[in-house]
From Swiss-Prot:
One of its GO terms (molecular function) is thioredoxin peroxidase activity. PROSITE patterns: THIOREDOXIN_2. It comes from Buchnera aphidicola subsp. Schizaphis graminum (strain Sg). This is Alkyl hydroperoxide reductase C. The active site is a conserved redox-active cysteine residue, the peroxidatic cysteine (C(P)), which makes the nucleophilic attack on the peroxide substrate. The peroxide oxidizes the C(P)-SH to cysteine sulfenic acid (C(P)-SOH), which then reacts with another cysteine residue, the resolving cysteine (C(R)), to form a disulfide bridge. The disulfide is subsequently reduced by an appropriate electron donor to complete the catalytic cycle. In this typical 2-Cys peroxiredoxin, C(R) is provided by the other dimeric subunit to form an intersubunit disulfide. GO terms for biological process: cell redox homeostasis; cellular response to stress; hydrogen peroxide catabolic process; response to oxidative stress. The keyword Disulfide bond applies. Homodimer; disulfide-linked, upon oxidation. 5 homodimers assemble to form a ring-like decamer. Keywords: Antioxidant, Cytoplasm, Disulfide bond, Oxidoreductase, Peroxidase, Redox-active center. Its main location: cytoplasm.
């Protein structure tokens, strides 16, 4: 089920913050505070593909921060398991210190509200949601468990959202930051296709 164009479900749940402290009533909407937010889910801590994704989000954190974008991650593990995972070095299967909140969905309520629960295993699929300033989901991608997500694609989508908001133009195939957009009109598409596809 796609949630694109719909209001993002809010939640209040325990989380471990970037300073390592545990917050029992982390409020997603309050934390986002009107900023674009990337909300992503992973199946479980101390597994296989998951640490590579979280470490990559952490490595590219500044790229999100300079775009004024918040990152929040969620899994069904407790905050104490999140904490133990952060306290484990990557060479031992851990993730080290993380610069964004890691939420505990121990009751599975959050993954159900976003409709990304695995039908048999009752864990989250690898889902990412781009939530805009008006709390609308503008982009969603869901991968099956064996396949890691593309962090660069999320950054590209943030750039596309910002471009559209600023100029009112749409972003054609393979659009990247710095490239020309397309006016959403018959004249606009004709001009663009003539320039790039003729």
């Amino acid at each position: 089920m796609t949630l694109v164009t719909q209001k993002a479900p809010n939640f209040i749940a325990p989380a471990i913050l970037k300073n390592g402290k545990i917050m029992n009533n982390f409020d997603l909407k309050k934390y986002s505070n009107g900023q674009i937010t990337v909300l992503f889910f992973w199946p479980m801590d101390f597994t296989f593909v998951c640490p590579s994704e979280i470490i990559e989000f952490n490595k590219t954190f500044e790229a999100f921060e300079k775009r004024n974008v918040k990152i929040v991650g969620v899994s069904i593990d407790s905050v104490f398991v999140h904490q133990a995972w952060q306290n484990t070095f990557p060479e031992n299967g851990g993730i080290g210190k993380i610069k964004f909140p890691m939420v505990s969905d121990i009751k599975h309520e959050i993954q159900k509200s976003y409709h990304i629960e695995h039908p048999e295993l009752n864990i989250a699929l690898r889902a990412s949601f781009l939530i805009d300033e008006n709390w609308i989901i503008r982009h969603q991608v869901v991968n099956d468990l064996p396949f890691g997500r593309n962090i660069d694609e999320m950054i590209r989508m943030i750039d596309a959202l910002n471009f559209h908001n600023k100029y009112g133009e749409v972003c054609p195939v393979n659009w990247k930051h710095g490239q020309e957009g397309m006016k959403a009109s018959q004249e606009g598409v004709s001009s663009y296709l003539k320039k790039y596809f003729s």
